[in-house]
């Protein structure tokens, strides 16, 4: 632990760079997925603005727009065949995924999708919401539930990585997740233009040059 705490800041920046690069080159080949990530990123930035003003509204934006567009890109548009750029199978990429791979995302998204139904039949969400929150209305309650699901998902996987990998990997991954919206805007702002040209798959020439 002492070694982790005394590691130079450049060590964490390099680990962050590697995680971001691997995430891009392995899991973001589809231009539609990239464009949806751009929409997601811009929506996340808006949700960040409301985070300390109205957490419920922030979560409604984050889950209702950002996560929906982001995950639909992964589930429906990202190729699942053999990755010739990285010379890796889909199964291998799923196994080495640091964050939430598709299997883990199914669990997280199931919790998200189940929350509105549970709240409809139990306005206090099985006793977890106090009366003041319930009086705020359905959307206010739903936003707070989604807020805690999001925070819980981030903390759970971060701590999980402490044991699966190491503390540095977990902390860097958490930082990556929180700053991804800003990075994705810089990375994918050209993707809609590529789509308009009819380019459905990023040729990933920049990734192939690293092999």
Place the predicted regions along the sequence by residue.
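Membrane-proximal soluble regions of multi-pass membrane proteins
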Residues: 2-24, 75-99, 159-211
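Membrane-helix exit/interface motif
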Residues: 47-50, 72-81, 117-118
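Hydrophobic alpha-helical membrane-embedded segments
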Residues: 53-78, 151-164
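Membrane interfacial helix-start motif at the N-side
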Residues: 17-48, 94-110
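Helix-coil boundary and interhelical linker segments in multi-pass alpha-helical membrane proteins
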Residues: 46-61, 118-144
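An amphipathic alpha-helical core segment
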Residues: 139-156
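C-terminal halves and exits of single transmembrane alpha-helices
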Residues: 101-125, 186-193
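Alpha-helical transmembrane segments and their membrane-interface junctions
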Residues: 111-132, 197-210
């Amino acid at each position: 632990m002492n070694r982790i705490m005394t590691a130079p800041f450049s060590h964490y920046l390099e680990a962050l760079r590697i995680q971001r690069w691997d995430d891009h080159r392995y899991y973001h080949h589809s231009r539609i997925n990239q464009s949806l990530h751009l929409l997601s990123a811009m929506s996340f930035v808006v949700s960040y603005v409301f985070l300390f003003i109205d957490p419920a509204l922030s979560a409604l934006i984050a889950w209702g727009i950002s996560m929906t567009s982001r995950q639909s890109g992964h589930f429906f548009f990202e190729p699942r065949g053999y990755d010739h750029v990285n010379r890796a199978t889909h199964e291998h990429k799923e196994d080495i995924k640091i964050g939430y791979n598709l299997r883990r995302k199914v669990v997280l998204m199931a919790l998200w999708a189940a929350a509105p139904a549970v709240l409809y039949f139990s306005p206090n969400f099985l006793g977890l919401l106090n009366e003041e929150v319930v009086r705020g209305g359905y959307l206010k309650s739903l936003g707070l539930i989604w807020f805690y699901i999001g925070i819980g998902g981030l903390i759970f996987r971060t701590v999980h990585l402490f044991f699966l990998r190491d503390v540095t990997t977990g902390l860097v991954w958490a930082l990556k997740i929180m700053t991804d919206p800003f990075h994705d805007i810089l990375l994918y702002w050209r993707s809609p233009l590529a789509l308009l040209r009819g380019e459905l798959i990023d040729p990933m020439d920049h990734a192939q040059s690293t092999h």
